[in-house]
Amino acid sequence: MSQPILVFDSGIGGLSVLAEIRKLLPHHDYCYLFDNARLPYGELEEQELVSGCVALIDQVVERTHAAIVVVACNTASTVVLPALRATLSIPVVGVVPAIKPAAQLSKSKRIGLLATPGTVKRHYTYELISQFADDCHVELFGSSELVLMAEQKIATGQLDMARLTQVLSPIVTADLDVLVLGCTHFPMLRDELQQVLGKGVTLLDSGEAIAKRVKTLLAETKSEQQVQEDANRDSVMQAFYTKAKISEGLVSMLVDCGFSTLERITTINSNR
């Protein structure tokens, strides 16, 4: 494995971002690190979140010699990036909720942000709204349950549509025309979300924008010869997780995604 792109999340949500990056960089090597022992991140205290993420990512970067880190988690990106960038010497890319494109796309100027409770309450989120959606009415919806529902869907192939409809009922009645998916888990539920919310609501996420940023950064750090060498070989994919056990369904899904190696990383926070 040669200087992989390291994609990090609390669970499997970051795979939606990884998929977008692979569309642009199909021959690159990838590591996917998910801290599922501490899932969901939206319920952690800020300092616990920062210290745990920085220690875990630093450990895997040192081991894999990653070329770039993508924090594919909205909750972590709102608080972890400064400390992570101070620790690492390689580029770090975070996730920004797609508030700006949502405001530009909305015709009714009524938009929503669906995210974890942690992202919804961060000052950073309110700054984004003030800066890019000042001319819009913005509704905020926080849910950790949807994160767990996305994880369950991937692990078991099943989703409780009746419960999903209940969770989304405040959004249905909010009369929005654009909804920002402010958690990387939520694109995993895109079809079901669209089914409940109807075709009148456009769903936006940040995956494509992140992929373009990663491609740009790699082009700045690699020579033309290295880029050509990458294009002429098969991609190698490795996954790391922190929980003591993962389900057979999740293992099967990761293998189907192309991961050849799955390994548990032991940390002080991963004894669950």
From Swiss-Prot:
InterPro entries recorded: Asp/Glu/hydantoin_racemase, Asp/Glu_race, Asp/Glu_racemase_AS_1, Asp/Glu_racemase_AS_2, Glu_race
The EC number(s) this enzyme carries: 5.1.1.3
Species name: Shewanella sp. (strain MR-4)
Protein name per UniProt: Glutamate racemase
Residues that hold substrate according to the record: D9, S10, Y41, G42, N74, T75, T184, H185
Enzymatic reactions: L-glutamate = D-glutamate
Record pathway: Cell wall biogenesis; peptidoglycan biosynthesis
Gene3D superfamilies per UniProt: 3.40.50.1860
A Pfam family hit: Asp_Glu_race
NCBIfam families: glut_race
PROSITE patterns per the UniProt record, alphabetical: ASP_GLU_RACEMASE_1, ASP_GLU_RACEMASE_2
Residue stretches spanning the membrane: none
GO biological process terms, semicolon-separated: cell wall organization; peptidoglycan biosynthetic process; regulation of cell shape
Active site: C73, C183
Protein function: Provides the (R)-glutamate required for cell wall biosynthesis.
Gene Ontology MF: a single term: glutamate racemase activity
Keywords: Cell shape, Cell wall biogenesis/degradation, Isomerase, Peptidoglycan synthesis
Enzyme class of the recorded protein, top EC level: isomerase
Assigned protein family: Belongs to the aspartate/glutamate racemases family.
